[in-house]
Structure formats: structure tokens, C-alpha cells
């Protein structure tokens, strides 16, 4: 959820050293994961999400379900990831909820939403397809509460342009996670 981002925005919005802001959240061109129209983070607090995406940063990159749900973290990937870890890290990973699920069910998979956003922060060249749109969040209570909105041209007053990530170089991403 975006509420903590508001504290940072109120303090640092005009900071000239902020080159870009990368958000994990929203689902612009596909169904949501908690309602038919909303992704969890923006549905949980759409008013905060709206303030955040309307902040006039020089560059905004949105990492939503549009890209995140194209690349599940499968059992095979998890095992490959474990193989490259030190014993103490391997033990820690195996003790997590995901580690326990992978041990019980070889068909288990999950998405790595925040990890993907962090990887793009480290290396924006991972992005291979994006759409630049004015973005907004529906903060009106109702069936589409928390819906991520994208406008190819101009959006409502106050909305800002953002790069919505659609596809990344998956091979480079997974290699980044397993590299030592």
C-alpha cells in the first residue's frame, strides 16, 4: 500500500536528485487480483495511491500485474535459486511461507512483484515493452474502487504521464536473481 509513500512525497517531491520513481502496483490492462478491476496495493488504499501517482515526478515507472503476472516463480526456478545460495541463506529461504509451499507442492508457484520492481530500479534496461500513458486511480467507492486507469492521451486534470511496464527480458531478470 502507498500510504508510506505519501510521507516521502511530502518531504522530497522537489528534490532535484530524484531521477525516477518506480512503483509496484496497479493492473492497467488486465483484471485485478483482489477484485475484477483492482490490484491489491491500490485497492487497499486508493486515495493514497491516487496521491502518489499524481505527484509530478520527472519520471514514473509503473510495475503492475500487467508484467508481474507474466512470469511466475516456479518450483524449478526456486530450486535453481536455492542451489546458488550459501547454507544459511538456503535455510532461511526454506523456512519462509514460499519455501514451505515449494517443499509440499512441486506445482506451487507465486509471483515476485516487489522483486521485479527492485530489479527494474537496479537495471531499467530490463524493460523491453512499455506504454506511456497518463495514469490515475479510481478512488470513488464502488465496484471499480482502486482500479488503475491509463489514458493514452491526456488523463483527468492532475494525472501524470508514466511508463507502464508490459514486458521485461525474463532471462536477464532470472539470471540477475541467481548471479553471485
Where on the chain are the PLM-derived regions?
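Conformational coupling and interaction surfaces
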Residues: 40-47, 60-180
Amino acid at each position: 500500500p502507498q500510504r508510506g509513500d505519501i510521507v516521502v512525497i511530502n518531504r522530497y517531491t522537489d528534490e532535484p536528485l530524484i531521477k525516477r520513481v518506480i512503483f509496484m502496483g496497479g493492473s492497467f490492462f488486465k483484471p485485478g487480483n483482489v477484485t475484477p478491476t483492482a490490484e491489491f496495493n491500490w485497492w487497499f488504499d486508493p486515495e493514497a495511491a491516487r496521491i502518489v501517482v499524481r505527484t509530478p515526478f520527472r519520471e514514473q515507472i509503473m510495475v503492475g500485474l500487467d508484467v508481474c503476472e507474466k512470469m511466475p516463480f516456479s518450483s524449478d526456478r526456486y530450486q535453481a535459486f536455492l542451489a546458488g545460495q550459501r547454507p544459511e541463506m538456503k535455510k532461511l529461504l526454506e523456512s519462509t511461507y514460499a519455501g514451505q509451499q515449494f517443499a509440499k507442492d512441486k506445482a506451487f508457484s507465486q509471483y515476485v512483484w516487489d522483486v521485479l520492481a527492485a530489479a527494474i530500479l537496479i537495471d531499467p534496461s530490463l524493460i523491453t515493452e512499455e506504454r506511456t500513458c497518463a495514469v490515475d486511480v479510481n478512488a470513488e467507492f464502488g465496484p471499480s474502487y482502486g482500479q488503475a486507469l491509463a489514458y493514452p492521451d491526456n488523463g483527468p486534470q492532475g494525472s501524470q504521464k508514466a511508463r507502464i511496464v508490459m514486458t521485461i527480458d525474463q532471462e536477464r531478470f532470472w539470471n540477475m536473481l541467481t548471479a553471485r
